[in-house]
């Protein structure tokens, strides 16, 4: 069985933290996704504040170097989140360096006992469909946060030529960032504008395919 949980990111919101959480809860979201480096409270205090609004929690943040993985994931685990989302490595790392990164990340994921997903983010290891496919084939236990807006930006096209890579990525996605990208950036100026209808349709199809893959898992 699969339960779809919808989270609102604190990213881009204005006002104080309590006001933001109140707005998220009032809007009917299941939880909040918070960037760890922007949280001024201690993990326990932040967790209690989130709990007071009956919200679930996803913690997100960057990990660039393998040596940072264990201490950073242990810090994120102290927030007792439902899961952790990572901006992983750098796009300039070799495949050998990237493999060393994910090997350590998966080992630490087991140690902390919380699911970790690695975001398909520009500037990071999973910045293209083909690099992502390489790592997913190397590591069957690796899961991703699908933010394909970055891929459209990096590829400067809707990557329809990447059928195998997309199918593999969709089968390993356990978290989605519902953002629509285009050739010139990771965020279309207005998803309602007719010139971006193909981009919206393409992203929505990937999200449907991810849902189908999760239901079949």
Language-model segment annotations:
Residues 1-77:
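N-terminal pre-domain/capping segments
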Residues 111-193:
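Acidic/histidine-rich catalytic cores of soluble enzymes
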Residues 10-12, 36-40, 63-65, 88-92, ...:
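Active-site-proximal loop/turn and secondary-structure-junction residues that shape catalytic pockets
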Residues 16-19, 64-71, 93-101, 127, ...:
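Alpha-helix N-cap and loop-to-helix initiation/capping positions
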Residues 57, 61-144:
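Active-site acidic/histidine proton-transfer and metal-coordination neighborhood
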Residues 44-54, 100-111, 165-168:
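Catalytic-core regions built around general acid/base machinery
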Residues 164, 198-217:
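A short, acidic, amphipathic alpha-helical segment used as a generic capping/interface helix at domain edges
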Residues 1-9, 32-34, 55-61, 82-86, ...:
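Hydrophobic faces of well-ordered beta-strands that scaffold small-molecule active sites
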